[in-house]
Curated annotation (Swiss-Prot):
Function: Component of the spindle pole body (SPB) required for insertion of the nascent SPB into the nuclear envelope and for the proper execution of spindle pole body (SPB) duplication. Connects the central plaque of the SPB with the half-bridge. Required for proper localization of CDC5 at the SPB and for proper M-phase progression.
Lineage summary: Eukaryota, Fungi, Dikarya, Ascomycota, Saccharomycotina
Chain's gene name: BBP1
Residue ranges the record marks as coiled coil: 201-350
Organism: Kluyveromyces lactis (strain ATCC 8585 / CBS 2359 / DSM 70799 / NBRC 1267 / NRRL Y-1140 / WM37) (Yeast)
InterPro entries (alphabetical): Bbp1_C, Bbp1_N
Protein known as: Spindle pole component BBP1
Family to which this protein belongs: Belongs to the BBP1 family.
Length: 398
């Protein structure tokens, strides 16, 4: 009915609806038969299995890359390649590991699950039922307490037969001829699971909020990391450019040093030292003596010229001072002469009138002050003679 790719989905649905002994989740339960001497399962390999390695080795075929055997992790039990567990339902058991890692595959509800126990109020005593008899009894009479479990119309729930071998042939015949008792379905409890669902939704909301906060935090950290990486990259490029400039400058300095060194060696080779001593070379000594004499004469001449120039400078400065004094005296004489002429002009333009008895104030009071002092007090520069000062300065210079 159902293929191996879907895991027998139709068969699982039929088993769940009609309350068969086989549960859809039994293939995921790790219930392996154990021997007394070893926990390994040694099964006979099937000759008709297409995954038999003998077929590939016989016909020199390449294995399919999508084959589950290739994608399966490496076995750590140390068995050789020939002894593989390849019984009929080995593929289903091996697919258990892959199914557990796949969250999209839906499983039948398990009463041992703590969430199922909390939602549907499964007793702790019921969760500890591990024997086959108690498990089958729980599946028969408590199927209405889990979603997906419905009462089967073909089974009688009131007739519980524990041992079929205890009936005799007559009893079986009487039971077969008796009228059939209609099956009575167990009463289904109407429980309100709203608070549990609300709590679960609240937890999911909190988890979603924490996931969003975590996502925002991760984005901020990623953004900060990218900014820091950009800044470090910028600094790295800057330091790299500085290093390149320093290397170029160091190379230039080294090249210049090499040039100077080779130039120094060339100059050193070009200079030929004299083979004779200076004491034995009279011409060189005479030349040195003449040069020293010339140096002395030039130094004496230099001192004489320096002294002469200083005397010349002093005489020029004295002449300059003499001329400045002369110009100052002449300026004062000219200023006094101009002032006298201005006074005479004023007297000529304003003659003095005789005083009368009627006039209360004399007209002489309106004359300027210069007129009063011109006749009464003689100016010291009026009869000035610059010959005396000139002669005095000349004697001072000498």
């Amino acid at each position: 009915m159902g293929s191996d790719d879907t895991g027998g989905l139709f068969k699982w649905t039929i088993d769940a609806l009609f309350n068969r002994d086989t549960s859809p989740s039994t293939m995921y339960d790790k219930q392996l038969q154990q021997d007394s001497f070893d926990e390994e399962i040694y099964s006979r390999p099937r000759a008709s299995s297409f995954s038999d390695p003998d077929i590939y080795s016989k016909y020199e075929l390449l294995r399919d890359e999508d084959e589950p055997d290739l994608l399966r992790p490496v076995s750590m039990n140390g068995l050789p390649y020939e002894k593989q567990d390849t019984n009929t339902f080995h593929a289903r058991r091996a697919r258990e590991r892959r199914v557990q890692e796949t969250p999209n595959i839906r499983r039948a509800p398990n009463p041992n699950d703590p969430i199922i126990s909390k939602l549907f109020q499964v007793d702790e005593d019921d969760s500890q039922l591990n024997t086959n008899e108690m498990r089958s009894q729980r599946e028969k009479f408590n199927t209405g307490r889990l979603p997906g479990k419905f009462p089967s119309p073909t089974k009688q729930y009131n007739a519980r037969i524990s041992n079929r071998d205890a009936f005799t042939g007559a009893e079986r015949k009487a039971a077969s001829t008796a009228p059939a008792i209609p099956p009575v379905a167990p009463s289904v409890q109407n429980l309100d699971y709203t608070p549990e669902y609300v709590k679960l939704m609240d937890k999911l909301s909190l988890n979603n909020k924490e996931l969003r906060d975590l996502k925002v935090d991760v984005r901020e950290r990623q953004k900060h990391g990218m900014e820091k990486e950009t800044e470090l990259k910028k600094k790295y490029l800057q330091i790299r450019q500085e290093l390149i400039q320093e290397l170029k400058q160091s190379k230039m300095i080294y090249d210049n040093y090499c040039k100077l060194y080779y130039k120094y060696k060339g100059v050193k080779r070009s200079i030929q030292l004299p083979t004779q001593t200076l004491a034995s070379n009279s011409s060189m000594l005479d030349k040195i003596a003449s040069l020293e004499k010339q140096i002395v004469d030039l130094s004496i001449e230099k001192d004489r010229l320096k002294k002469k120039s200083e005397e010349r400078i002093l005489s020029v400065e004295l002449q300059k001072k003499e001329l400045e004094n002369k110009f100052e005296v002449e300026r004062m004489i000219y200023e006094r002469r101009i002032k006298d002429l201005e006074e005479k002009l004023y007297v000529h333009e304003h003659p003095i009138r005789p005083a009368t008895d009627t006039s209360p104030v004399s007209s002489s009071s309106f004359m300027p002050h210069t007129q009063e002092t011109s006749d009464s007090t003689a100016s010291p520069y009026k009869e000035y003679n610059n010959t005396i000062d000139t002669q005095f300065l000349r004697n001072l210079v000498k």
